[in-house]
């Protein structure tokens, strides 16, 4: 999960807390020091993949240029499940199956290819 959120989405780790008595680690990530933080929990003895992933809805982030951001993610191996056909919104999933919405800051960008003809993939 850290590879996805840090290396692919560009977030940074701002704090980490080891909790030996509970056998878990909390990792706090943010897009910027002044931004809201995302808390990831690593359970030390979790041997099976987590199930679910959209039982709380989804996480949303705004980006400066949705086309550039989606292109960067594709180059890093992230599948764009709902392409930004409208110049405003896209969906991806984390390796733990968390649904992530990407939103264009401000008004939608002009519609452009290849995004406008791309189909949805899977569940988002």
Language-model-detected regions and their locations in the chain:
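Core segments of cupin and vicinal oxygen chelate
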Residues: 1-37
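A general structural signal for stabilizing positions within well-ordered secondary structure
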Residues: 5, 50, 91-94
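Flexible, glycine-rich phosphate/dinucleotide-binding loops
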Residues: 20-22, 35, 47, 106-109
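Short histidine-centered beta-strand/loop micro-motifs
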Residues: 49-52, 82-83
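Eukaryotic phosphotyrosine signaling hubs
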Residues: 54-58
């Amino acid at each position: 999960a850290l590879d996805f959120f840090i290396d692919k989405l560009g977030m940074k780790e701002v704090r980490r807390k080891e909790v030996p008595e509970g056998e878990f680690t909390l990792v706090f990530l943010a897009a910027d020091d002044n931004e809201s933080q995302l808390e990831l929990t690593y359970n030390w003895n979790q041997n099976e993949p987590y199930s679910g992933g959209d039982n709380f809805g989804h996480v949303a982030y705004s980006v400066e240029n949705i086309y550039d951001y989606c292109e960067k993610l594709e180059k890093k191996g992230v599948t764009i499940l709902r392409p930004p056909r409208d110049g405003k919104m896209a969906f991806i999933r984390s390796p733990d199956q968390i649904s992530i919405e990407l939103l264009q800051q401000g008004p939608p960008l002009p519609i452009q290819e290849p995004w406008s003809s791309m189909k949805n993939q899977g569940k988002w």
